[in-house]
Structures are given as structure tokens and as C-alpha cells.
Amino acid sequence: MKTYSTDHIRNIALLGNTGSGKTILAESMMFEGKVIERRGTIDAKNTVSDYTEIEQQNQRSIFSTVLYTEYKDHKINIIDTPGSDDFVGAVISSLYPADVSIMVVNSQYGVEVGTEIFGRHAERLHKPIIFAVNQLDHDKSNFDQTLESLKVSFGSKVTLVQYPVNAGSDFNAIIDVLTMKMYRYKGDTGEREELDIPAEEMDKAAELQNTLIETAAENDESLMEMFFDKGTLTEDEMRQGIRIGLLARGIFPVFCISSKRNIGTKRLLDFIINVCPSPDKMPASKTIDGKEFKCNVSEPASLFVFKTSVEPHIGEINYFKVMSGKITEAMDMVNSTNDGKERVSQLFAVAGKNRQKLPELMAGDIGATVKLKNTKTNHTLSAPGKSIQFASMTFPNIKYRTAIKAKNESDTEKLGEYINRAHQEDPTIIVEYSKELKQILLFGQGEHHLNILKWQLLNLYKIDVDFLAPKIPYRETITKLAQSDYRHKKQSGGAGQFGEVHMVVEPYIEGAPDPKKYNVNNKEINISVRGKEEINLEWGGKLIFYNCIVGGSIDTRFLPAILKGIMEKMEEGPLTGSYARDIKVAVYDGKMHPVDSNEISFKLAGRNAFKNAFKIAGPKIMEPIYEVEVLVPSDKMGDVMSDLQNRRSIILGMDSEKGFEKIIARVPLAELHKYSTALSSLTSGRATYNMKFSSYEQVPADVQDKLLKAYEEESEDE
């Protein structure tokens, strides 16, 4: 392969819902560029993308795959992406290096949940969108309905460049209103005839061309003046206006294809090289300090790693985009993210698992390298002495959690190592050990997402694991005032132990004044605050500790021990062993022994006095509540609402959004285990959701009773 200059490079990401036909479109693009001699199929398991065993088993894309084609003296880098929201991390990391996104839409269904979700991510990253309406050869295809759904979801900027003449099982002809030609295709080879538009289609084509001209002119003042002067635009002027509009997301062109029959691929490729921007025409990228950095070959060399993966027999592969300058084989660079030195020993153009060695890559190109020592996803490499660090990619909040445990105890250490490696490949996979719950917790985007990781652990690394229901990080608190005193006394010959502590506990309420007196158990206790310690607890909430000792009944040197005893019990709450929070404790009296009193005595006295007071202070268990936003088709709204209500949710609001219904609800975390699977089952995979932590709230009485009983049984078993 020759070296391509920046102006002859195009970078596209193929987006779309599962089953829309992205992978087969990529096959057709590579076939037209003669990168492959024949097109593969999903059923035959011989596509260039989807080459991993797990993808072939599932017959769908699970990972992003970097590809390329060479077409009319241009290199088009193509990134094929998964269509399931479970693998949104791969979609986002593909959008970053892409300059244009091609949204493949199944003409049987129109806008699907993946179309909507990935469209939002393209919008957030300000990436142009071209719609490729696919599967027009299907007998259930409905182009008009698909177009209408696109306009509902993406607005009036959706503009036809092409429309099908005969969508359905006999589909073989497209009318293009940019070139004002009809293209008729023969078989599935991509061969076509370029014909004049039939008379019976001319009025429709002319009307649509006029709309395209007006939309193109609206994006540029000089073109608008030409349009007013001449009443029309030439084909080249239209391309200029569309190019400007694409960059500004002021136009979303619509193309017609059948990737299965290779219909429309050449026209789409022509549009990509003639209208879509080259990397140097794209808006500047941002560095971590907010500076803008243009893609320019004359600048010092830099690259950004958007994907890291591990391939059998090869090791770690880093996929990158050349952000500036040019990268040459055996080039020494500096990792601006961690200050490490790296040598880019080899450069490759990549098409799935196939790699072609290259001597250099120019600004804007996409390639891969191996054997970097300490460079991962989101890292920047730059020329020595020219430190540049690009802003990291950002990913959605996690929305699925499970506990994970190696079946063989000896694999536990290896398990952590390989999951951390998985996180480097897919930043939406997160693992942590919860000291509180005493579980290894695994977080991701859905059950299917983490099941793929489970398969990889077993089949690639020979680690068999179990997924367990994750425990819930409950909290404990109190709702009323209570008093307790406790004497710790131990005598067994020699020096003994003695400490007595009197305390009052009450709920912490922000802004409430310090205590002066308490009325408790028909007794008035006057308080004189001598010292106050306000502790922001690691697990959330507060502890306010008051020293109210007068007359030296407890020496001040023992107060830290009392506080330590209280904190120990708050770390293992009196009700269920969960963290306690939002409590005020006033130690106002006690007793010492001149010989037997020591720190351990007062720690134990403080711990037990607190425990006893807590249990009579209206103790409550609190549970984490998440705000959940569900995007669901209208016909499934009732089922989803009913399911949410069965999960003890509170519906905050409902709204219509771009052809979907949006439900916002507050749902206990305990009710969200495997929700992604349940939602998929309820809606046949047509809905999605996201969630974020909201607050802790008291559990209902019946739930508290169940939790107390379960904790009691668990304690007996131990």
C-alpha cells in the first residue's frame, strides 16, 4: 500500500442498530476498493470484520473492527461497530477518530433504539451523520416510513440525496437527485447502468433536487447569493454546500443501499471521497489544557490511541489516529500521558485480523502498532520535546453490576489481572473490590456485555468464574433521640479493665444547633459542649462527636478511644452490619478507675454504649436509590411502566422524545439487578436505559424486616 496524503484520507465510523447491515456494507466497500476479492457473509462466518470466535458464534458485532478500503486514489478508513447498547464503549471509541459517521438504518424498522442512542453520541461529539437506508431489497422494506421516522428523530435536516425506484424483493434501481441520474444494478456484483431519469419520475426527482439545492445553499452565504441570482446551483456548488452543511451538522444526507446485493455502495463511496471532509478540514481537536490543535502534517508528530486489544500469538495491539505530523517506522516518541518513552517499531494498516506493514502514516490516517511498553487506550504519544496530550474519551455511566468469583481459588489473582486488561480494552468494564460488601464487583453496560467477558475469561485465559448476585450497600441510621450508658469491667488477676461511658445519640440534621439539654427517658440532661468533632464519613454522611464531659469524670485522653469504638461500630452497623451514617453523639458522663482504666476499656465501653443507644433510637435501614431514564417504543410503554412499578419505583415524569417515550423514575438499586435483561425481554431489545445514583432513602418496614431476618440467619450460619 502506498502512503496517502492527508487530503486523500477519509475516516468513517459505521453506526446502527444490531441487524442493520453495517458489517456487510463494510464488506461491499472493501470489495469495491479491491481490498478483498469476494464479499463474505455473516452465515458463512467469513467477513473481514466480526472475525473473532465469539462474534461468529453470536452472529453479530461485539467489538469495533478497524478496516480500510482504497477507492479512486483515496484511502477510506472504516470502523465497523457493534449495534447493541451493551457495547456502547466500542461505538464511542470509534467515533473519536472518525470524521464522519454513516448511520445504517434497516428499512424494515426505521429508527430503532440503537439509531437513537448512537445518534446522540455522534451529536455529543459533533460528528456529521450520513444515513444509509439499507435492506431495501427486503419484501417488508418501507422507505417512506423509514424516512419519516428519521425526520421525527433527527429533524428537518434529514435530506434525501437518493430514493429507491422499486423497493422490495425486486429492488435494483436508485434515483440520485445530486447527479440527477438513475442507477440500475445487475445482480450482486455492484455493476450498474447510469441512465436518464424516467419521465414518470422526473417531477418527483426535480422537486427533491430543489429541496437539496435549497438546503445546500442555506449552509453558505455565497451559495445562497448564487441561488438567489440563478435560481439553482451546479452539481459542484451543491457538493460544496453539502460539505459545509455536513461539518456543521446542518444537513443529514440520506442514501439508499442494499449491502447484501451491493447496491448503492459505489455512489456512497463517491460521496465520501468527493463531499466528506478530509481530516485536515475537520474542527481542531482539544488538548487537556483546552487548546485547539489542527490535524496538520507540518506540525510535530503526535498520535492518539483510541483502542487497545490483545490478539492471540501477537499480544497487545494499539490502534491510533495520527493527530499531526507523520509517524515513521522505528520512531522514538514520548507518552505524554505517563511521561514514558516508547519506540513505534512497526506500523500497520489494518483490515480486521489482517495487517499490512507500512513505512509511515501521515496526519489524519489510522493505523496500528505492537510492542509498546506502557501505552494504552486514551494515551497520547508525541515527538520528544513537543509534549501534546489530547483530551481523553469519556464514556457513559455503568448500568449493570454483578459480583464475580473465580471457581478455583488459585485463579483469583489472575482474575484481577485479566479483568484489568479487559478494562484497558473496554473502559466501560470496571472492576473493584468492595471492602464493605466483601465481594469483587464487576460493572458494565448490561448482562450480555459482561457475559462476553465471562466467555473470554474461560476461553482465552482458562479462568472459570461465577457471577453472583451483588450485595446492596445499605446504610443504617437513627430517627430519634436515645440515651445509653455502658460499663466495661474485666478483672482476671493483675491489672484489669474498666471504663464507663454515658452518651446520647440523635439524628444528624444539617443546620441544626449544637445541643444544650436533652429530655430523654423522662429525665432532663443538661449539656455543656467542651469540644466538637465533625467527621465526613468515607461512605457518605456525617458523624458529629461532642465532648460534653464536665468535672473530669472521664479523662480527655480517653475520648479518642471512645470515638474509635463508636467509629468501629458505625463501620459494622448494629442492625445488618452495614455502614451507619448521619448521627450526632454526645458523651456527657462516665467513670474511671485510677489503675484499671485504659484506652481499650473506653473503646469497648464507647462501642457498646453506642450500639445499645442506636438500637433504641428508631433505627432504620437505608437503601441506595438510582434515577433511571428509560427510552422505550410507544407500544411497549405500558409493559415497561408496569414492570417499574413492580420494582418499588416512583415515576418522576414521562415525555415523548424523537419517536420514543421517555420514562424517568427513582428505583431502589436492589430492584435493578438484571434489569437490562428484563427490559430487553419486555421490549424485544427495542428499549434502553441509563441510571445514576440519586440518594439514600429509608426502606419500607416489610423490606427492613426481611433484611433483619436475613442478617440474623446469616450470622447464625457463621
What residues fall within each predicted segment?
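Short hydrophobic beta-strand that contains or immediately precedes a catalytic carboxylate
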Residues: 78-80, 255-256, 442-443
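A short acidic-Thr-Gly-centered motif at the start of a beta-strand
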Residues: 5, 67-72, 244-250, 431-434
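P-loop NTPase switch module centered on the Walker A-proximal segment
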Residues: 1-105, 109-111, 204, 218
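Amphipathic alpha-helical transducer elements in NTP-driven molecular machines
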Residues: 6-9, 22-23, 45-48, 59-64, ...
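P-loop NTPase catalytic nucleotide-binding module
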Residues: 1-20, 38, 107-312, 333, ...
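Gly-rich Lys/Arg/Thr-decorated short loops/hinges at beta-loop-alpha junctions or inter-strand turns
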Residues: 46, 72-76, 96-102, 216-226, ...
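Short, surface-exposed connector motifs at secondary-structure boundaries
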Residues: 73-75, 99-101, 126-132, 248-253, ...
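Accessory interaction regions appended to the cores of large information-processing enzymes
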Residues: 149, 158-160, 164, 168, ...
